Amino acid sequence: MNAVTVLAFTAFALIVHDCYSEEANTTPISVKDQCANVTCRRTVDNRGKRHIDGCPPGCLCVLKGPDSKDNLDGTCYLLATTPKSTTTSTEQSFNMEE
């Protein structure tokens, strides 16, 4: 019984070794970063709504400054996944009474 177990374990180890020791032909994924060196800007329209413009689809605008400021510049960064929406402007509500 022990000999059968050892033989089965050895066979399994050899199969696993063969499967994972082969060198696979891989092609590195080269993603063109459309967000590199792209700046974005947050502005407020006359109705008090914040707008973020400047980043292409699939990029996230990271603003440089506190959230309390309305007009800020930022940098676009590539997201891990591309959103289904193709809009490049984001609107946020802004309460002028605060």
From Swiss-Prot:
Its transmembrane ranges are none
* GO CC entries: extracellular region
Does this entry carry the keyword Transmembrane? no
Q: Where, by tissue, is this protein expressed? A: Expressed in salivary glands.
Which compartments does it reside in?
Answer: Secreted
> Which is one GO molecular function term here?
toxin activity
Report disulfide bridges, numbered on this chain: 35-59, 40-61, 55-76
Which superkingdom heads the taxonomic lineage of this protein's source? Eukaryota
Q: What is its main location?
A: secreted
Which keywords annotate this record?
Complement system impairing toxin, Disulfide bond, Secreted, Signal, Toxin
Which residues, if any, are the signal sequence?
Answer: 1-21
Family, according to the entry, reads as follows: Belongs to the RaCI family.
Task: Please give the function described in this protein's UniProt entry.
Answer: Complement inhibitor. Prevents complement-mediated C5 activation by binding to C5. Binds C5 at a different binding site than the other tick complement inhibitors OmCI and CirpT1, and the drug eculizumab.
What name goes with this protein?
Answer: Complement inhibitor RaCI2
- The organism named in the record is Rhipicephalus microplus
Upper lineage is: Eukaryota, Metazoa, Ecdysozoa, Arthropoda, Chelicerata
